[in-house]
Amino acid sequence: IKQEESPELLEADQYFDTTFLNEAAAMKVIDSATRSAERDTLSLPEAKLEEWNIATDTPAAAPILLTKPAGADQNVVPIELFSPDAMMRFNRALTRGAAGRPVRIAVLGDSFIEGDIITADLREQLQNLCGGRGVGFVPFASPLAKFRGTVLHSFSNWDIYNIRDRAQIPAAIKDRFFVSGFVCIPQEGATTRLQGVTFRKHINQAGTARLVFTNRNNTRLNVVINDSVSRLFAPEPSEHVQQIVINAPVHSISVTLNRTDGFTGYGIVLEDAGGVSVDNYSIRGNSGMALFE
């Protein structure tokens, strides 16, 4: 059958040209953008890191490490692209256990997810399936601390700024916001304490705690793990984001800050070395545009 003599073939060709070829072109653009983003990420300065390994001082149950779900590659549920390829990158990340870190999932939203609503269920189900422990990212201070049931959170002497309330943000910190949409500026003697709970599975304890901040001067941080083991940190001044990483079975962590001038606090991440970590980034009234501000 000649193509020009068959309306069905012409229609099929037109469908192929306008659908599959366009989809292939779109995937090339996405892959190109991904490679570009990876190159940009590699060119950024690495966050300065201090580690504290105290696992032998704080005995606890063995961490839940990553296990690949049975049939993960065959039983993928297509969500948007209606193709089993849609979740390939996620599954590759899950099976790349040698990376030494969990697969991190950020859930951004407005008041609909405040207090870990929805994300608590998502985190629990993913950690049931894929392993991992910990509640993920928690700001040093938050106006929602009393309403969040997935972590016991107390703090004092912090000034909290929300990217949605730009009129209230001092000019000196307008360019310091984190993806969470909050920054926390400490006063002298500021404190923060987080403690795991049994309200949900897998969040009573984690294998790692990360303190994320920028220390432009000479702030001192006294960190206490499980109300028993303490250490004073004096990170070097830097304009870049810094981390203090505590490798231990962490049920609770307390932080006290002194010489706080020039310190910008973001938060503490409680997670494991494998599995899945789900971060809740809720900003009341956020339409999604806060990411671009």
Predicted stretch roles:
Residues 75-97, 177-198, 229-232:
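Short N-terminal or domain-adjacent regulatory/targeting segments
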Residues 104, 114-218, 223-224, 233-293:
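Conserved SGNH/GDSL esterase-like catalytic core that processes O-acyl groups on lipids
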Residues 38-75, 80-149:
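Long, contiguous interaction/targeting segments characteristic
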Residues 1-2, 260:
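Hydrophobic membrane-insertion alpha-helices, especially the h-region
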Residues 2-59:
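Juxtamembrane proline-rich low-complexity "stalk" or linker regions positioned immediately after a signal peptide
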Residues 2-9, 34-38, 73, 87-88, ...:
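Proteins with a high burden of low-complexity, intrinsically disordered sequence enriched in S/T/G/P/A and R
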